[in-house]
Amino acid sequence: MLLVLLLCTCVRAQIAERPTSGELHAGIQKLQVLGSALYMAAHPDDENTRLIAYLANVDKAETAYLSLTRGDGGQNLIAPDIRELLGLTRTQELLAARRIDGGTQFFSRANDFGYSKHPDETFNI
């Protein structure tokens, strides 16, 4: 019984971050706006971060970016063994960008297979 009591007092739950007064004020202002925007693009480096930041912070719209791929295709000159790591790196970059610009990040399951010069090349991949 004593062991259970000691375990219960030692276990700590994750402490929630307390928002600053500025973050609370921005959140209240955002509640007064009825609007949302979804920015869609094929690759992680195709987004317009200035537009996302403007819509999220100035217009106070619920703003999100949908990247259809994670950018693991890269350029055809990049070695195939780096593809997955490149996708992971670009994913983390997008998540960090959304923490800065105030948007929400979404991904689809589309596979990035690199550049194609001709439609036949695309369908063969």
Regions flagged by a language model, labelled:
Residues 1-12:
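Bacterial N-terminal signal peptides
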